[in-house]
Amino acid sequence: MSKDEEAAPQSEEQVLLRVEALREAARIITGDRDVQYGGPEDNLTRIAKIWSVLFEREITAEEVAMAMVGVKLARFVSKSGFQSDTWIDIAGYAGCGYEVGKLATGE
C-alpha cells in the first residue's frame, strides 16, 4: 500500500463522521458557553489560578485544557460502550487548548 493510499480516507461516510464530531465540538465551544463561562482564555485561566493554589505551582490555561482531556480519557476507562459526548468534549478541549496555547506563545 502506498503512502497516498494509507492517508486517504476509506469512505465518504468516514469523512462525514469525523467532520460531524468536529462540527459538534465547534458548535459547543463557540456557542453560548462563552456567555455562561467566558471565553476559553478567561475560563481556563480562572481554573489555572485555582489549580495553582491547590498544587502550589503555576498552572497555565493550556495545561488545564490538557488535564481536562486527561479527565475525559479517564471516563473511557470507567464506562464501556461508545461515548459520543466524551469524544466531542475531547475535541472541544483540544480546540480550546490550541487557542490559548497559540495566544500565549504569539505563534
Predicted regions and their residues:
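Intrinsically disordered, low-complexity regulatory regions
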Residues: 2-107
